[in-house]
A protein has these predicted regions:
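Flexible loop and strand-edge segments within Gram-negative outer membrane beta-barrel domains
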Residues: 200-211, 221, 225-278, 284-301, ...
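Outer-membrane beta-barrel translocator/receptor signature
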Residues: 113-115, 121, 126-201, 207-214
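C-terminal beta-signal and adjacent terminal beta-strands/loops
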Residues: 417-418, 481, 582-585, 608-665
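C-terminal beta-barrel architecture of Gram-negative outer-membrane proteins
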Residues: 552-614, 625-629, 633-638
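Gram-negative outer-membrane beta-barrel transporters
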Residues: 319, 356-362, 463-474, 492-588, ...
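Structural signature of Gram-negative outer-membrane beta-barrels, strongest in the C-terminal barrel
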Residues: 223-225, 318-320, 341-473, 563
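Acidic, small-polar-rich N-terminal luminal/periplasmic segments of exported/outer-membrane proteins
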Residues: 22-149, 167, 263, 417, ...
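Membrane-embedded beta-barrel scaffold of Gram-negative outer-membrane proteins
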Residues: 160, 187, 277-291, 409-412, ...
Length: 665
């Protein structure tokens, strides 16, 4: 039965969490595994089971991860107190730098095109990309081979869906084929049309628009060990939206706005044996926002990366050697004038060796990065180019020891580094004067983690696993793009932050029943903050804030998920709960203590997917999200004081009934 297989995959994922110190979470939208141990267990059916429409639908259960934003225009990821501008985010290996406008999302993605999400919460491995202060997220899009049954050469999948809260209707079509041996191709297109939604208290939220995404991917495997593929992915969100999408209750300046991303990748893979697993990816990504007030803002990122893995066994010693190199270039633009575009060139090389001696694994690693930002210095009429240059070695070391069968202790250290990015495109379009900071330092930090993990088997189809972690990261020289008294744009270092916390995860699989519970606690202490002028009538003191750190400390997060598979009728039912405790917190930008209210949100869902018979290929997913119509706003949002200006509160959707029907043939 299909759902019996699904829970075998969930069980395998539970084993994976105890196989690596990075940790693993099986979500109600897609199974996500940590990258540190190299294991990656993915069940792509689960993304449809949760009726995922946004990134938060597939990531909110992960310990250490917070996701804010009520629509595709403003969804933002936070990981251990670091925003997505301080994470390394890739799609099919293509780096995503989308810092166009701070009131909008930097990441645009359609979950319906995603088959896997690999997450490293915290920075432990040097292999997970340059500039990862708080961790990394790697999205992988679907392939034709994922959808074709054995012996099939062509197929299609049609989908239609409805969401009641915003009167959303969605449609999707996929065509996939392997016309000749070794050649595979997929074409997918999705559309969503929707109206404004409503929060639990009846407030108008979101926008009135149409979203469109498509994926074209062609691959060819040859000579047993070689594969080459090319893909083109497009995402666009367009419609009537607030000028500041994250202030979802402010509709006085609603107008037609469009935000889109295009990513093109060319990939070569060579995998002859365990001695060599090579992957080379060249890519181009463009984020572009078309706005009647802000005009056209965007960021282009081009790059190439080569990564390899070699596994060597010698007696009692097994070595897993990961090594590679990476280059990327980012440019901002602001049309029609585009006076002073900036450019980042980043080069890095890394090596990591996991040495396994029976019950002990030691993983040393090191990355070297050369980072340069080509900016400007001078006043209007006499502006000259100025280049910031940084060189940094970032070592890492991890130890994992099996104390007794199934019980492991682990500890890790990593130095983190991130150079200054191109300035946000909105600021670039306005800047006329620049003041170079010849004493500017790159952001660095020291990341520590320790914990225990346990896995036990009850039977062939049943198991349980536990994971407990404590982490501490000390950041210094956080960078802020600041306006000086004479109106010039200047980058400054604005202190640091110590972020610590605890992450707990427990899973139980009993044949057809799967239970998971998690807890996340984090604490942020700001160091040596720099005073700045207050805005919008705020009472001082006010401080310059870096956009790579979250807006404030957040409340404790609890999650619970239960799923049961009725294999005899090919049906899965599930329940998901997320609860945030209230907390008195101080924002990064001031000393005002604000109480963030608690909230609890319950979802129920069910999937029917016949594994045989005349209805094989049919899949029906239905659920009620925010079952009890709770009034709440994400604790990750910019505005902490919900009792302040109501226009700045980004209320989350109220009760929402979703249904999606698809048929694959």
């Amino acid at each position: 039965m299909r759902f019996s297989g699904l829970f075998k995959l969930s069980l395998a994922a539970s084993v994976a969490v105890c196989a690596n110190a990075a940790g693993e979470s099986v979500l109600s939208g897609v199974e996500v595994t940590g990258m540190g141990g190299g294991a990656n267990t993915v069940d792509d059916i689960k993304i449809s089971t949760r009726n995922a429409g946004l990134v938060k639908d597939v990531m909110r259960d992960i310990p250490g991860v917070y996701v804010g934003g009520t629509n595709g225009m403003n969804q933002k990821i936070y990981m251990r107190g670091v925003s997505d501008r301080g994470l390394n985010i890739t799609i099919d290996g293509a780096k995503q730098n989308g810092n166009t406008f701070h009131h909008n999302a930097d990441l645009l993605i359609d979950p319906d095109l995603i088959k896997a999400v690999e997450v490293e919460v915290g920075s432990k491995s040097v292999a997970n990309g340059s500039g990862a202060l708080g961790g990394s997220v790697a999205f992988k899009t679907v392939d034709a081979k994922d959808l074709l049954e054995s012996g099939e050469i062509i197929g299609a999948k049609i989908r239609s869906g409805y969401a009641s809260n915003s009167s959303e209707f969605s449609q999707g079509l996929m065509l996939f084929t392997t016309p000749v041996e070794g050649l595979d191709f997929i074409a997918a297109i999705n559309h969503k049309g929707y109206d404004y939604g409503k929060s639990g208290n009846g407030n108008k939220i979101g926008g009135d628009g149409n979203d469109l995404s498509y994926l074209l991917k062609l691959g060819y495997s040859f000579l047993d060990a070689h594969r080459i593929s090319i893909s083109r992915e497009h995402n666009e969100f367009k419609g009537i939206y607030p000028i500041r999408a994250e202030f979802g209750s402010s509709h006085a300046n609603d107008d037609y706005r469009k935000y889109e991303r295009d990513t093109t990748t060319l990939k070569y893979e060579y995998k002859p044996s365990n001695l060599l697993n090579l992957e080379v990816t060249a890519y181009n990504t463009e984020h572009k926002k078309d706005d009647p007030v802000l005009k056209i803002l965007g960021v282009k990122t081009n790059g190439i990366n080569a990564k390899a893995k070699s596994v060597v066994e010698s007696g009692a010693l097994t070595q897993t050697f990961r090594y590679g190199t990476e280059f990327y270039q980012s440019k901002n633009f602001s049309k029609p004038d585009n006076h002073y575009p900036e450019k980042v060139n980043n080069y890095s090389i890394y090596a990591e060796d996991a040495l396994n001696f029976s019950s002990l694994t030691i993983t040393p690693g090191i990355r070297y990065t050369h980072h340069e930002l080509k900016s400007y210095d001078g006043k209007a009429g006499n502006v000259k180019s100025y280049t910031y240059k940084f060189n940094e070695f970032t070592p890492a070391l991890a130890l994992d020891y099996e104390i007794v069968k199934g019980l492991n202790a682990f500890v890790s250290y990593a130095k983190v580094f991130r150079g200054p990015d191109v300035i946000e495109s909105m600021y670039a379009g306005r800047a006329k004067n620049f003041e170079a900071n010849k004493n500017l330092k790159a952001t660095t930090g020291n990341s520590y983690e320790t914990g225990l993990k346990y896995h036990g088997d009850i039977s062939e189809a049943s198991s349980y696993s536990l994971s407990a972690k404590y982490f501490m990261t000390k950041y210094k020289n956080l960078i802020v793009d600041s306006n000086t008294a004479n109106g010039a744009l200047k980058r400054i270092n604005a202190g640091g932050a110590d972020i610590s916390g605890v992450e707990l995860l427990a899973r139980l699989n009993l044949d057809a029943l799967s239970l998971a519970v998690s807890y996340t606690h984090q604490s942020v202490k700001y160091k040596d903050r720099v005073l700045t002028s207050c805005r919008r009538g705020a009472i001082g003191p006010c401080y310059s804030t870096s956009n790579v750190i979250g807006y404030r400390d957040q409340g404790d997060k609890y999650t619970f998920n239960a799923e049961y598979a009725f294999s005899s009728i090919d049906t899965l039912v599930g329940y998901n709960l997320i609860y945030f405790a209230s907390k008195n917190t101080v924002s990064a930008g001031n000393d005002k203590s604000v109480n963030i209210p608690s909230y609890a949100v319950s979802d129920i869902y069910a999937t029917y997917s016949p594994s045989s018979g005349k209805f094989k290929g049919l899949e029906i997913n239905a659920g009620i999200y925010n079952l009890f119509n709770k009034v709440y706003a994400s604790q990750s949002q910019r505005t902490a004081d919900y009792t302040g200006d109501p226009n700045y509160v980004d209320w989350e959707p109220g009760r929402n009934f979703k249904v999606n029907v698809s048929y694959k043939f």
